[in-house]
Amino acid sequence: MTGIRSALPNPASLVESSTHRFLIFDAPNDDNLPLYINELKKYNVSHLVRACDPTYSTEPLQAIGIQVHDMPFADGGSPPDAVVNNWIKILGESYKKDSKETIGIHCVAGLGRAPVLVAIALIEGGMNPLQAVEYIRERRRGSINIKQIQYLKNYKSKKKSSCRIM
């Protein structure tokens, strides 16, 4: 967690790497979306990834310049290749050296699908899979189940080069 005070019922978790900032949270709905928008603004979110079925309109987010990407996959499961490839594309598009822009990402509870995608980003950045899980869990307790850990342990980076610097 960070020093920024949250108005959300379940506080968001900031995960930072050498190349990206991620804000993991649970799914908003149309009624509480304004609270989430305030939080997204605090963290300078430019891209928002929904890893679950939609529960709110994207229009208010798009109106303030946040690009919304739908990448749903099964609860408790691992992302299919198409989701991983889209996720990596977003990581590439959003990378800016020394940027304080953040990628917001959520699933229903913010404990499974969203943290798995963030772990993939950390692995793509050169982090060991189990270190990535531990790093995320330090910031978002209870995240990533055993099945997802197994997937991450076996995950192979999509980068062309095997030489990586964290």
From Swiss-Prot:
Residue numbers of Cysteine methyl ester PTMs: 163
S-farnesyl cysteine lipid attachment residues: 163
Key words, A-Z: Disulfide bond, Hydrolase, Lipoprotein, Membrane, Methylation, Prenylation, Protein phosphatase
Cystine bridges: 52-107
Catalytic site: 75 (proton donor), 107 (phosphocysteine intermediate)
Catalytic activity field: O-phospho-L-tyrosyl-[protein] + H2O = L-tyrosyl-[protein] + phosphate
SMART domains documented for this protein: PTPc_motif
Membrane topology label: Lipid-anchor
Binding site for substrate: 113
Pfam (any one): CDKN3
Binding site for phosphate: 108-113
Domain Tyrosine-protein phosphatase positions: 10-164
EC primary class: hydrolase
GO terms for cellular component: cytoplasm; membrane; nucleus
An example Gene Ontology molecular-function term: protein tyrosine phosphatase activity
EC number: 3.1.3.48
Propeptide: 164-166
Places the protein is found: Membrane
Similarity-based family: Belongs to the protein-tyrosine phosphatase family.
Protein name in UniProt: Probable protein tyrosine phosphatase type IVA A
Lineage of source species: Eukaryota, Amoebozoa, Evosea, Eumycetozoa, Dictyostelia
